[in-house]
Amino acid sequence: MKVLLIDDDEALTTIFTAALTKEGFQVVAVNTGQEGIDKASTEAPNLILLDQVLPDLSGNDILKQLKLDEKTKNIPVIIFSNFSQEELVKEAINQGAVDYVFKYQVEPKDVIEKIKRALGQT
């Protein structure tokens, strides 16, 4: 199973890439929204972990684009967010995100469980 991780926090990306790889996932990590949109289309991930705040686009703008594209509209998206962005998370869920994670207060194992649940593996 392939996970696309779209996040500009290098330390967090390293931690989650290692944890997901250890669990048998293939991880494609990018740090801008446009790279994420491009990789979602070309890499055909099984799931996307999407940060809400990126240097070039908001997570919700990326989610909108993903849901409009035939190639990516059915890929489950889990939002990575901070507590200060709860309204954005609610908006993302309304736009089709399957779940959310408050990224700085969660263990990788909890994210892996959410991924497995979203992929129907639990």
What is each of the regions a protein language model found here?
Residues T14-K22:
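Charged docking surfaces used in two-component/phosphorelay signaling
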Residues G24-N31, K39:
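Short hydrophobic/Thr-rich beta-strand motif most characteristic of the beta2 strand and flanking loop
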Residues T32-E35, S58-K64:
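Acidic catalytic/metal-coordinating carboxylates
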Residues T13, P55, Q85:
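The feature encodes the CheY-like receiver
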Residues E43-L49, L54:
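Active-site beta3 strand of CheY-like receiver
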Residues D7:
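Conserved acidic carboxylate
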Residues D61, S84-E113:
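Alpha4 helix (beta4-alpha4-beta5 surface) of REC/receiver domains from two-component response regulators
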